[in-house]
Swiss-Prot record:
Organism: Nitrosomonas europaea (strain ATCC 19718 / CIP 103999 / KCTC 2705 / NBRC 14298)
Catalysis performed (reactions): a 3-demethylubiquinol + S-adenosyl-L-methionine = a ubiquinol + S-adenosyl-L-homocysteine + H(+); a 3-(all-trans-polyprenyl)benzene-1,2-diol + S-adenosyl-L-methionine = a 2-methoxy-6-(all-trans-polyprenyl)phenol + S-adenosyl-L-homocysteine + H(+)
Annotated function: O-methyltransferase that catalyzes the 2 O-methylation steps in the ubiquinone biosynthetic pathway.
Keywords assigned by UniProt, alphabetized: Methyltransferase, S-adenosyl-L-methionine, Transferase, Ubiquinone biosynthesis
A GO biological process held by the record: methylation
Gene3D superfamilies in UniProt: Vaccinia Virus protein VP39 (3.40.50.150)
Its EC number(s): 2.1.1.222, 2.1.1.64
Name of the protein described by the UniProt record: Ubiquinone biosynthesis O-methyltransferase
Length: 235
C-alpha cells in the first residue's frame, strides 16, 4: 500500500494512463489484450455456465475490453479502475458500442466494504502483477463474490521461461508490449496465487495456460502454465 492507503503503484497507473487513448486500437500496444480477450471470455463463460443475467465485477478494468465483452453476453457488469484516463476512454467507447457497463473509480478494497457478497462473478485480469499488495486484492475479490460464486485471476508465472518469454521476448524482441510493461519480481507462481486465494477463503477450481506462437502469431489456451495462466476459484 502507498502512503495514502491505496493499493496501487503511482508509476504503474501513470504508465497505463499515458497509453489510455490506445485501449481500443487493436493494432496498438493493447493488441495482445484484444487478441487474448475472446479466449479468456469464452473460458469464463464456459466455466460458469453462461454469463447471461450474472452480476459481474471486473477489477482493474482499464479501458473496458473484457468488461464490454461480458456485458455483450448479457451480464450486468461493473468495471473498476484507478486510472481516470482509462475510465474516460471506457465510458466513451460505450457510446460507440451501445453496451452497458457501470464504470467506477474506486479501489477493490473499498468496494468490498461497500458491496460484500454482491457479485456472481469477479474477474481480475492482468492486474495482480502490477500492484504492491496482490494478497489484499485477492482478499477483497473474495469478499465481493457471493457464496458459490466464481473468481478469476490471470497473471504471469515466475520462472526463467516466463522472464525469457514475457519480458525479453514480448517487450524487447517481438515488441508485442512496451518495454517496462512488466517487472519480473512481481510475477506470481500458481502455487503462490492458490495459497493467497485459500487464505482468503476461496477454493481452486481450475487452471489453464495461455500460450503465444510467434510463428503463427496465434494465442491459445493450453495446459502449459509456465508463462501466462488463468485460475478459477469458487467461493
Amino acid at each position: 500500500m502507498d502512503n495514502d492507503g491505496i493499493n496501487a503503484d503511482p508509476m504503474e497507473l501513470e504508465k497505463f494512463s499515458q497509453l489510455a487513448h490506445h485501449w481500443w486500437d487493436p493494432n496498438s500496444e493493447f493488441k495482445p489484450l484484444h487478441e487474448i480477450n475472446p479466449l479468456r471470455l469464452n473460458y469464463i463463460d464456459e466455466i460458469i455456465g453462461g454469463l447471461s443475467e450474472k452480476t459481474v465485477i471486473d477489477v482493474g478494468c482499464g479501458g473496458g475490453i473484457l468488461s464490454e465483452s461480458m456485458a455483450a453476453r448479457g451480464a450486468s457488469v461493473t468495471g473498476i479502475d484507478l486510472s481516470d484516463k482509462a475510465l474516460k476512454v471506457a465510458k466513451l467507447h460505450l457510446l460507440e458500442s451501445g453496451n452497458q457497463v457501470d464504470y467506477r473509480k474506486i479501489t477493490v478494497e473499498a468496494l468490498a466494504t461497500e458491496r460484500p457478497r454482491y457479485y456472481d462473478v469477479v474477474t481480475c485480469m492482468e492486474m495482480l502483477e502490477h500492484v504492491p499488495d496482490p494478497a489484499s486484492v485477492i482478499q477483497s475479490c473474495a469478499r465481493l463474490v457471493k457464496s458459490g460464486g466464481w473468481v478469476f485471476f490471470s497473471t504471469l508465472n515466475r520462472n526463467p521461461k516466463s522472464y525469457l518469454y514475457a519480458i525479453i521476448g514480448a517487450e524487447y524482441i517481438l515488441r508485442l508490449l512496451p518495454r517496462g510493461t512488466h517487472e519480473y519480481a512481481k510475477f506470481i507462481k500458481p502455487s503462490e496465487l492458490a495459497h493467497m486465494a485459500r487464505s482468503a477463503g476461496l477454493m481452486e477450481s481450475g487452471i489453464v495456460g495461455m500460450t503465444y506462437n510467434p510463428i503463427t502469431k496465434v494465442y491459445a489456451l493450453e495446459a502449459d502454465t509456465s508463462v501466462n495462466y488463468i485460475m478459477a476459484f469458487r467461493a
